[in-house]
Amino acid sequence: MRLIIVSGRSGSGKSTALDVLEDNGYYCIDNLPAGLLPQLAENALINTELQQPKVAVSIDARNLPSHLTRFPELLEEARTRHIQCDVLYLDADEDTLLKRFSETRRRHPLTNANRSLAEAIRVESELLGPIADLADLKIDTTSLNLYQLRDSIKLRLLNQPEPGTAFLVESFGFKRGMPVDADLVFDVRCLPNPYWKPELREHSGLEQPVIDYLAAQPDVEEMFQDISTYLLKWLPRFAASNRAYVTIAIGCTGGHHRSVYITERLGQLLQQSLKNVQVRHRDL
């Protein structure tokens, strides 16, 4: 049995995540009291009417604070029943959450006459801290629209042909912020920039003119070799430590040229020696 626990601050995309999981065959429960987590795991295994191979639940700040504080031991108790438990934590920056509540005109569950929306969001962060700390996978939804979030969840949680650590090699542009879910970040902004070549500006690192230009630059090749050597040596150690997910982020200024080129090459290289290697270009 596989159990996916979805959590995160209000407005970060938990409902969308549950919808995706339900569409992919998961039995979903919204706003499960955290204290019932071990009981759910046991019932799903032994009760033939409830038995499901794939279950997903959301746990949010409407829980009793004491249950959220006890989340680490509740999760461990569920895992002792030999269930594969994955914790997905969704989040976005505070300005984005404020904007989403303003646009939808929904009420935050922790607001009241004495607590503003901004204060409620900060209180929610504290309450959900024990879950965030134990997340196997964190997804920053700040820059994702609905369809991108659905694709990201399917890519990271559901597209795993082999058991073991799932590796994501992701390009991004620093001007839109670093991915908060990145485990390793490599800055390639020091490399020659095709953006300053008028004939290359409108092309991406996936297109042959940019590929040919960057492949001819000695610094680019040296950077690629250095990053490759590091990853080939140390990523197997991450896998050996039972990490469920590892995100390697490659950043340039805009996320269109240098980081895309390096990311594509790294993905192709790592797929030759590691299982579950996926490639994503955040800002294309």
Curated annotation (Swiss-Prot):
Cited SUPFAM superfamilies: P-loop containing nucleoside triphosphate hydrolases (SSF52540)
Transmembrane domains' residue ranges: none
Nucleotide-binding as UniProt keyword: yes
InterPro entries found in the cross-reference section: P-loop_NTPase (IPR027417), RapZ-like (IPR005337), RapZ-like_N (IPR053930), RapZ_C (IPR053931)
Pfam family, one: PapZ_C
Alphabetized GO MF terms: ATP binding; GTP binding
Binding residues for GTP: 60-63
Keywords per UniProt: ATP-binding, GTP-binding, Nucleotide-binding
Highest taxon, organism lineage: Bacteria
Binding site for ATP: 8-15
Function, in words: Displays ATPase and GTPase activities.
HAMAP family linked: RapZ_like
Family affiliation: Belongs to the RapZ-like family.
Protein name per UniProt: Nucleotide-binding protein PSEEN1090
Annotated organism of origin: Pseudomonas entomophila (strain L48)
